[in-house]
Amino acid sequence: MADSQIQNFNHLKIHSQFSICEGAIKIDDLKEISKEKKIRSLALCDTSNLCGALEFAEKISKVGTQPIIGTQINFKLDDTIGLLPLFALNEIGYKRIIELSSLSYLNNDGTSDPHLNFEEL
């Protein structure tokens, strides 16, 4: 992919080292890639947590890349669990994602991964 194509591409589901067993890239590495490729925006979308959100936002914005904060929540419908990416548009959205992420752990009976059901969304 040419550099100009990379610059215009917005990756919306990056999993960092905070997505255990799913992502391995470190925030510092994302920062360097963003700077080198002049990427306009990136979305951090770790699974069931926002542990890297502050570090990501601070470091990525320093190299001129717009950080997009999100998470990937396990969503249960009947007996099926799927993945639902959620992104914050602003501070209110960020706080709501924090609430939903916490709720996915608090209401979990321990027999499955943290998840939300339709009513909780």
Predicted segments with their positions:
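Phosphodiester-processing cores and adjacent nucleic acid-binding clamps
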Residues: M1-L121
